[in-house]
Amino acid sequence: MSDVLQKMETRRSIRKFKADMVPQDIIDKIIEAGLYAASGHGEQNTIMIQVTNKELRDKISQINCKIGGWKKGFDPFYGAPAMIIVLAKKSWPNRVYDGSLVMGNLMLAAHELGIGSCWIHRAKEEFEMDWGKELLKSLGIEEEYEGI
């Protein structure tokens, strides 16, 4: 079995994380793998946002928890110290498919590099909220993007 197929077979969603920050060079490699994802017509309309700031990470978690309807204090990111948010241009009809391929690459690369990962939903709802739109604006992202 090839290394790639073996990694696909053994990758699992992780729902308990260490508090230790993932080294930046590892995060960079994971993000780079996301850039290699296939996309409709080769458009590459997805963007990735790395979140390692604990205060911002906790705020995103609180909003995600509220959207998900969980009890206050539940962390839908399971204590992960870092996250990579994937967004795609709202105007692109293949946005969900393209963003999903990016997510798959990110999770597979994380596994290859010894880092646990888990796809967490509700980014679409978070970035439709005024708070999410303001966050994107503060990061210099002016176009309309949808969370994947």
Feature-to-residue mapping (PLM):
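Acidic, surface-exposed loops and disordered segments
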Residues: 1-148
